[in-house]
A protein has these predicted regions:
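Exported/periplasmic ABC-transporter solute-binding proteins
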Residues: 1-39, 43-48, 52-59, 67-68, ...
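Central helical "cap/lid" subdomain
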Residues: 81-83
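Phosphate-/polyanion-interacting regions in eukaryotic proteins
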Residues: 64
Length: 247
């Protein structure tokens, strides 16, 4: 499949980078003098996940996903290897419904207690959810007690939205995906000893019909000019923040 018009650049981004990317759209459109068409979705296994959309041959120019996933796309010939650009580091956090009691996450022991005491736990269908269910609870020695209480949130829905509706007591996702959601509180990172930092990267699709504009987008997202929006979204930019020369 090919893009219907070269006046549009299509971007697929996973949830963790979405808030920063949306903030930067006006600058990006000014830079490339084209309209951006965005699909904000997950890197899970659902029908509309980024991996499945790419493999179906949906038109796309730029892809933003967890670094390990992007490397896999490069190996599969879906992304141009020389366009691989790390953008930001992302931490996993926990949230509760606004007004609910705020569990302690200050230590590993406190996190373990919070997981054991929670009646229901929501997690994403991507990096943070995989870590919670396949590594963290095993490392804490509580998999048997906790996994039966977990609920996978798929189809591109934010974990925070499920928490805000009261459908789960606590939820885990990338902090940058929790922060924009109304109706939740106490967005708190995991303790450093058990935190899993994910790097999110961008690349140009091998099928792009406008490689020049696509590469310009990737370069800008990885530059100091994009760092403020990345920081404000709850991520840590790879590129250093561009300091103002004023004053």
């Amino acid at each position: 499949m090919t893009n219907t018009t070269t006046d549009e650049i299509r971007v697929m981004t996973s949830g963790a980078f979405t808030a920063a990317y949306l903030e930067l759209i006006p600058q990006l459109e000014l830079l490339i003098k084209k309209k951006l068409v965005t699909a904000a979705t997950s890197i899970g296994t659902g029908e509309n996940s980024i991996p499945n959309r790419l493999r179906r041959g949906e038109p796309v120019d730029v892809v933003i996903v967890a670094d390990a996933v992007l490397v896999g796309f490069i190996k599969d010939g879906l992304i141009m290897g020389d366009s691989h650009t790390p953008l930001a580091r992302s931490a996993i956090g926990m949230a509760v419904r606004a007004g609910a009691p705020k569990p302690d996450l200050g230590t590993v022991a406190a996190l373990k207690r919070t997981l054991l005491e929670a009646k229901s736990i929501a997690h994403s269908a991507s990096v943070s959810g995989d870590y919670l269910t396949t590594e963290l609870v095993q490392r804490l020695g509580i998999a048997d007690q906790v996994l039966s209480k977990t609920r996978l949130i798929g189809h591109g829905e934010r974990v925070g939205a499920v928490i805000a509706r009261g459908e789960a007591e606590i939820g885990f996702q990338q902090i940058s995906e929790l922060l924009p959601v109304a109706g939740i509180d106490h967005v708190t990172p995991l303790p450093a000893e058990v935190q899993k930092i994910a790097v999110f990267s961008a690349g140009v699709a091998a099928s792009t019909t406008n490689p020049e504009a696509a590469r310009a987008i990737v370069r800008f997202l990885g530059s100091p000019e994009a760092a403020r929006a990345i920081t404000d979204s709850g991520l840590e930019p790879i590129a250093p923040l561009k300091l103002s020369s004023a004053g």
